[in-house]
Amino acid sequence: MLSVNELALDIFEELFEYAEELHAVPHELDNGARIVDCGVSTSGGYLTGRRFTEICMGGLGEVDISMGKIRDFPIPFIEVSTDFPSIACLGAQKAGWTVNVNKYFAMGSGPARALSLKPKHTYEVIEYEDEFDYAVICLESDHLPNAAVMENIAEACNVDVANTCAVVAPTASLVGSIQVAGRCVETAVYKLNELGFDTKKITAGIGHAPIAPVKKDGTKAMGSTNDATIYHGSIMLTMNAPEIKDYLDKIPSNKSKGYGKPFYDIFKEANFDFYQIDTSLFSPAEVVINELSEGKVYHVGAVNPEVTLKSFGFI
């Protein structure tokens, strides 16, 4: 069986070795754990963001960045594709691990989750778990983890702490903007999973989303990076599942009652309480489904340039 940690480790090793050329900073802790700072105390960059995203997808995704436009405004776009959508997106990329050790907090994603099985239900549904002696984790945080944090991760993954590897970037950083936009396909797969659809029937996924300009404030950065997919993420999924027609109307973000405002404004109105936000908002703007058994194509949703540009600060 494919090992997402083994595949991601190869990318991590390259990032660690060539960190200086990538505006990243490598660290090896006293306990042997290795960390690459991709934006906490350094600038990071587009190539670093690509590598971060590839690691987050467990080495099962292809990532490209190119310039595009939203109306008359030039903006970089990330394009992500995978031929293993269920494993790459839910088994690795999903931010399903809250790392909270002493005073350290981070949202954890990446292939290490497939060792720790966080959350376990996800791996039961996709019928996948990894077996490998290295754990590779992606941490969305303003701070680097210390030895105690890495030991906690190692214990959860049942590996030696010297075999733990972490890439770290704040939301309010270039790599942060890139890797969140790089979750555009994941949001579609995640949404279908939440609706009860068997995501193992999805055979391929591709999508693109604009990379949000970096905000100084972390909460505002969280808003604009999420808006990249909510209001301008375009996804195509290939599958063998004629029953998908029963799910179409519930997939895109414009079906959410919170739709129509920048995420930061919605979050502020909810007194910055996630539990008051309609979770169906966390979906791509538009999705195309190519259903193979009946040879049909479905299209739902639409991009919203107005809200995207407002969120990004262009208008």
UniProtKB/Swiss-Prot annotation:
Question: Highest taxon of the source?
Answer: Archaea
InterPro entries annotated for this entry?
A: METHMP_CycHdrlase
Give its localization: Cytoplasm
Q: Which terms are listed as keywords in the entry?
A: Cytoplasm, Hydrolase, Methanogenesis, One-carbon metabolism
GO molecular function ontology, one term from the record? methenyltetrahydromethanopterin cyclohydrolase activity
Pfam families tied to this protein: MCH
Report the HAMAP family cross-referenced here.
McH
UniProt-recorded name of the protein = Methenyltetrahydromethanopterin cyclohydrolase
